[in-house]
């Protein structure tokens, strides 16, 4: 099958789910608009903020791009885990905690690879996301619990990627005080700074190490993240591959996988 035929087939596969996502956003905008009008008529103070739509031309481009990333991702369940280039993000305490609990001094922007954090004896849970992605940030407390409960048998890595909803792009509507306002990353320093902003609000356990994707977004592309995704690497292979976010981003599946494979060892520890 030729390249053009493959591209056409992928496009035809994407179109139905793309339009269903657009329909969902249109319904969401309609509900929010109705709520806004009701509050306006009642002269509520809640209407002071500017109403912004989710279904915009910028939003549609982002959604389409996310499906392309998912369709062309390199990562496959049971196959070799892509060893993407990333950079260290130092913890608020000024260090990086290794898998054995020791503090290691790291500097923002120090180059490394994703599989540098993988151990032959322990699975590596990799969580991809950004501060401007509400489904990702809403699940960070649950992710922190996973780290605390299973750090004796597994390693954890958070990979900070391109912003899902930058303030100068497809911004999230609503009360800005509830969300992060981060602009599109112009350089690696911007991306590391955004990761620090996330860590300042969400205190992750020291056992979870944090890195940022390179500006070429190679980790995002290899793992087909787009907005958020979680996977588990074991012996350099993909042992678990979570679905495409936001609708199929599911940390409960990660918990079930860890409980199935390591619950007895956790109880002994």
From Swiss-Prot:
UniProt region (Disordered), positions on chain: 83-103
Modified how: Ubiquitinated by MARCHF6, leading to its degradation by the proteasome. Deubiquitinated by USP20 and USP33.
Catalytic activities: 3,3',5-triiodo-L-thyronine + iodide + A + H(+) = L-thyroxine + AH2; 3,3'-diiodo-L-thyronine + iodide + A + H(+) = 3,3',5'-triiodo-L-thyronine + AH2; 3'-iodo-L-thyronine + iodide + A + H(+) = 3',5'-diiodo-L-thyronine + AH2; 3,3'-diiodothyronamine + iodide + A + H(+) = 3,3',5'-triiodothyronamine + AH2
Active site, renumbered: 133
Example GO BP: thyroid hormone metabolic process
Membrane topology: Single-pass type III membrane protein
Localisation per UniProt entry: Endoplasmic reticulum membrane
Tissue: Highly expressed in thyroid, mammary and pituitary glands, then in hypothalamus. Low levels detected in diaphragm, heart, kidney and lung.
Cellular component per GO, a single term: endoplasmic reticulum membrane
Sequence ranges on the Lumenal membrane side: 1-9
Bilayer-crossing regions: 10-34
Subunit relationships: Predominantly monomer. Can form homodimers but homodimerization is not essential for enzyme activity. Interacts with USP20 and USP33. Interacts with MARCHF6.
Similarity section: Belongs to the iodothyronine deiodinase family.
Name listed for the protein in its UniProt record: Type II iodothyronine deiodinase
Lineage, top ranks: Eukaryota, Metazoa, Chordata, Craniata, Vertebrata
């Amino acid at each position: 099958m030729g390249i053009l035929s493959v591209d056409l087939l992928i496009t035809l596969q994407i179109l139905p789910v793309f339009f269903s996502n657009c329909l969902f956003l249109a319904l969401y905008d309609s509900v929010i608009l109705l709520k806004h009008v009701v509050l306006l008529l009642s002269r509520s103070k809640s209407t002071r903020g500017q109403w912004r739509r989710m279904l915009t031309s910028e939003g549609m481009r982002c959604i389409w791009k996310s499906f392309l990333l998912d369709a062309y991702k390199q990562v496959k369940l049971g196959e070799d885990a892509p060893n993407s280039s990333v950079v260290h993000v130092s913890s608020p305490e000024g260090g990086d905690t290794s898998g054995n609990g020791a503090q290691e001094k790291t500097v923002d922007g120090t180059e490394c690879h994703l599989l540098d954090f993988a151990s032959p004896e322990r699975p590596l849970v990799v969580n991809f996301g950004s501060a401007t992605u509400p489904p990702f940030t809403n699940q960070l407390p649950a992710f922190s619990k996973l780290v605390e409960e299973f750090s004796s048998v597994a390693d954890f890595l958070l990979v900070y990627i391109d912003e899902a909803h930058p303030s100068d792009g497809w911004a999230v509507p609503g009360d800005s005080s509830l969300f992060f306002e981060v602009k599109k990353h112009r350089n690696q320093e911007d991306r590391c700074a955004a990761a620090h902003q996330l860590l300042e609000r969400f205190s992750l356990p020291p056992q979870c190490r944090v890195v940022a994707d390179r500006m070429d977004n190679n980790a995002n592309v290899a793992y087909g993240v787009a907005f958020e995704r979680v996977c588990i690497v074991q012996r350099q292979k993909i042992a678990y591959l979570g679905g495409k976010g936001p609708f199929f981003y599911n940390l409960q599946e990660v918990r079930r996988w860890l409980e199935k494979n390591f619950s007895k060892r956790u109880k002994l520890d």
